[in-house]
Amino acid sequence: MSLFKKLSLLATGLVLTTSPVLAQSSSESSQSGSTQTSYESLEAASNELTPKLKEALDLKDAKKTLDNLAQLFKWEVTDSKESQLANSDFKYTIHRLGPEAVLLSTPDNKVLAFAMAKLDADTIRQRMAGLGVKPEAQMERLLNREPSPVDKVFVETKDFGLILSGHRIGQDEKKPDKPQYDLFVIYNHDFYKAMVKDFE
């Protein structure tokens, strides 16, 4: 199994174990009124959301970031769970924000990673642009191609470490031709290296 495939299992596993949206099947998700309402609110705010999202992320203060994101999305921090990488002393806390976001923080309150669920390819581009990340050509090709049942995309950037997008979780009824993705951004290179070391 390749390193990227192993990383995908860990990264998507973090989101899957902390996000009830991703834990549901696409049919269950489409039947959930609250999930659909939440997704529609994201879509409605998409034009102005990216600069606000960038402003909300304070990498040096996870608690402030959680408060900012909760206010921005009208979400609550519903769960916080401490964890540790299997073959490393790297400890972190997983915070669940509402139904569609996860934030990972260090014991000293720094932001490690941020994940959002149930996004389409265009929304991912907007989020990445808002975070100062330019999608690479490989990612553009993969985002533009015909979706497969499970479609994973990896982009490694100099400033952000690993960006994972592309765990397809179903189709939006309003955009049946567009796949749904996750956005998983690792901001801390030490954490990224520790993840890699876990699979060596």
List each model region and its residues.
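Bacterial N-terminal signal peptides that target proteins for export
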Residues: 1-8
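Bacterial N-terminal signal peptides
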Residues: 10-18
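Sec/Tat signal peptide C-region and signal peptidase I cleavage site
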Residues: 19-23
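Cleaved targeting-peptide boundary
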Residues: 24-39
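Second-shell loop/turn segments in exported
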Residues: 50-59, 111-118
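N-terminal secretory signal peptides
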Residues: 55-94, 100-101
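Long, charged/polar, surface-exposed segments that mediate recognition or autoinhibition
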Residues: 96-155
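Short, low-complexity, Pro/Ser/Thr/Gly-rich segments in the mature regions of secreted, periplasmic
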Residues: 184-200
